[in-house]
């Protein structure tokens, strides 16, 4: 270690200041090549989840997942199957759309010594049948789950934390319908009991809600950005193209 680096480390330690580490930089959507350094295509478990969209995307197919100019674009289009297939995931809805989902290669695990800040700017559809989200979910089992952004076919963003399937805290915040970009942030910090995680949610720099994840400390989480359709957002969904954009996304831990 260079002497000056050692001196800074000692100073930070004496002062009780923890260094910040960038997990996902704000330029991860600057190009496909950079995107592929930090993100994977589809869900961690495959192409299907609990809505009416089947995810499509790969290093050779960017018709539904694209990255450029620090912006991720997810696109959902109706399918034309006379007899639609069904999702392989519960509750096995009929597939009416092809769409896009990505998840971060780095998992997020809050510990007593590692808190996380997740930030991004979102242009989200709010029409009935559109179900975009920006969320954390357990790598093993379920819950934990925390939804930083979830739009379920209404002009609201839902901040959610699932402690069980029935013990859920939700805070709804009004969301504009003009597809303008607005920022969302979540700060995840371990509580002093060493088991629970405090989650502070903000929109456009204003604190909106504080929720608590029971037993979330030490649990590895996937970070997912998806454009799901119908399901909890109502039906029928749009008959044309739906676009969901995320820009300047950054994840840090201290």
Question: Where do the model's predicted regions map?
Answer:
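Short strand-turn-strand beta-turns centered on an Asx-Gly dipeptide
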Residues: 202-206
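Low-complexity, Ser/Thr/Pro/Gly-rich disordered linker/stalk regions
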Residues: 18-128, 139-143, 148-154, 160, ...
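Short tryptophan-centered beta-strand motifs in secreted/extracellular beta-sheet-rich domains
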Residues: 29, 118-120, 180-192, 199-201
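Flexible glycan-contacting loops in extracellular carbohydrate-active proteins
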Residues: 212-244
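Short, aromatic/His-centered strand-loop micro-motif at the edge of beta-sheets
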Residues: 162-183
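Beta-strand acidic-aromatic groove motif in beta-rich domains, primarily in extracellular
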Residues: 128-136, 195-198
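Fungal secretory targeting signals
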Residues: 1-20
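Beta-strand-rich interaction surfaces with strong enrichment in secreted/lumenal proteins
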Residues: 100-110, 134, 169-176, 213, ...
